Swiss-Prot record:
This is Immunoglobulin J chain. Part of the secretory IgA (sIgA) complex that consists of two, four or five IgA monomers, and two additional non-Ig polypeptides, namely the JCHAIN and the secretory component (the proteolytic product of PIGR). Part of the secretory IgM (sIgM) complex that consist of five IgM monomers, and two additional non-Ig polypeptides, namely the JCHAIN and the secretory component (the proteolytic product of PIGR). JCHAIN-containing IgM interacts (via CH4 domain) with FCRM (via Ig-like domain). GO terms for molecular function: antigen binding; IgA binding; immunoglobulin receptor binding; peptidoglycan binding; phosphatidylcholine binding; protein homodimerization activity; protein-macromolecule adaptor activity; single-stranded DNA binding. Pfam families: Ig_J_chain (PF15097). The gene is Jchain. Glycans are attached at N70. One of its GO terms (biological process) is protein-containing complex assembly. Its main location: secreted. It comes from Mus musculus (Mouse). The keyword Cell cycle does not apply. It is found in: Secreted.
């Protein structure tokens, strides 16, 4: 009897795995690691009208607990407010080469890119490709000096 139940359990897991891998792939619209967000989109059949398809958007936000107001300063107070603007999360300002009528053109994927705004993006998590440092006191031979320490050593020091 236990073997019979075990086989049914394995079969249920296998069927679930097949159904999950058979799902339509979602298109990633934005994956902002700095703000811990991901926006995906996929086309699914409408439940109301079988002749129509609708766009389903999924917005995943991971709220990092115990993060600091200033992620580069370990002594700053804990962050209590997290503000997300969908237009900022989905903004893609990196230039992309697009072919238009046998001509390659460089364009951005967003029309709200403004190089002159000067306001840095608020990061709720370390961007692993960016080097973050802070000044820390170091005591050596009875003398205390302020030295710069890497908060993300992998991105600050090449192999």
């Amino acid at each position: 009897m236990k073997t019979h139940l075990l086989l049914w359990g394995v079969l249920a897991i296998f069927v679930k795995a097949v159904l999950v891998t058979g799902d339509d792939e979602a298109t990633i619209l934005a994956d902002n690691k700095c703000m811990c967000t991901r926006v995906t989109s996929r086309i699914i059949p409408s439940t109301e009208d079988p002749n129509e398809d609708i766009v389903e958007r999924n917005i995943r936000i991971v709220v990092p607990l115990n993060n600091r107001e200033n992620i580069s300063d370990p002594t700053s107070p804990l962050r209590r407010n997290f503000v997300y603007h969908l237009s900022d999360v989905c903004k893609k300002c990196d230039p992309v080469e697009v072919e238009l009528e046998d001509q390659v053109v460089t364009a951005t994927q967003s029309n709200i890119c403004n190089e002159d705004d000067g306001v840095p993006e608020t990061c709720y998590m370390y961007d692993r490709n960016k080097c973050y440092t802070t000044m820390v006191p170091l005591r050596y031979h009875g003398e205390t000096k302020m030295v710069q320490a890497a908060l993300t050593p992998d991105s600050c020091y090449p192999d």
